[in-house]
């Protein structure tokens, strides 16, 4: 079913993400590296000179405060983040940034999301055999003829089980609950805020729930067994959404009339 969905719905192209902004992290390279490595859940040492990486920050209890994509542009790191989370990101990290003489600067660059052929992965932060997801950053207006809409861009993320939190969902989930342990967290890099709890839940916790992508017919009505997280996408006669589901309910739910697949 997954391959069929890819073939029917995935569309290559670019989408201007009007509600995302770019925050430059300023300071000496060594200090910026130390600061980011001690705060972000991902390992910035794994980013190449022009690379992108899914990341996030947590509070001391291991709850995700906000998520974003970090980009390395030579010696400069850029945080690409929803505009409603940018101030939260800066406010949360400002007390720690002062110890490293690090500053944050919101710039005027434009963010463009890309759904690309899998052979074109140099701009990507996620890839499989069918397609890649990436970003482009422009100083001025961009002009391309391969534009896609928001749903077409978000579709690739839903199928990849990549979630972007909004303001109402901050500090509600730990990484293991929303697939961030697989996509936005490094368990080899060392300490960051909330790291001990995140690692404990990963290695010692019992997985009673699963973060899933649910594909249903348009008329399907969600009940209390399916906790929808994020935006629901509507494509023709189907719906695609992210959800947290009890493992004990999965077999029952996938057999319901109107459920096409649970990934």
Model-derived features: positions:
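Basic, glycine/lysine-rich polyanion-binding surfaces/domains
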Residues: 1-263
């Amino acid at each position: 079913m997954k391959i069929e969905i890819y073939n029917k719905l995935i569309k290559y192209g670019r989408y201007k993400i009007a509600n995302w902004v770019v925050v430059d992290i300023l300071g000496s390279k060594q200090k910026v590296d130390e600061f980011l490595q001690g705060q972000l859940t991902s390992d910035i040492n794994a980013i190449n000179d022009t690379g992108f990486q899914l990341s996030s920050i947590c509070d001391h209890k291991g709850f995700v405060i906000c998520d974003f994509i970090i980009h390395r542009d030579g010696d400069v790191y850029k945080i690409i983040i929803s505009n409603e989370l940018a101030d939260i990101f800066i406010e949360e990290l400002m007390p720690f940034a002062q110890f490293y003489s690090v500053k944050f600067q919101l710039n005027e660059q434009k963010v463009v999301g890309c759904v690309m052929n899998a052979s074109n992965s140099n701009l990507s932060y996620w890839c499989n055999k069918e397609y890649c997801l990436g970003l482009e950053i422009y100083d001025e207006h961009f002009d391309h003829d391969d534009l896609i809409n928001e749903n077409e861009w978000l579709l690739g993320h839903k199928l990849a089980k990549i979630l972007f939190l909004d303001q109402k969902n901050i500090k509600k989930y730990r990484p293991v609950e929303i697939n961030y342990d697989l996509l936005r967290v490094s368990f080899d890099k060392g300490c960051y805020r909330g790291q001990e709890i995140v690692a404990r839940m990963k290695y010692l916790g019992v997985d009673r729930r699963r973060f899933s992508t649910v594909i249903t017919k348009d008329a399907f009505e969600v009940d209390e067994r399916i906790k929808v997280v994020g935006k629901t996408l509507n494509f023709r006669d189907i719906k695609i959404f992210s959800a947290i589901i009890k493992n004990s309910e999965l077999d029952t739910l996938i057999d319901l009339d109107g459920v096409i697949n649970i990934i």
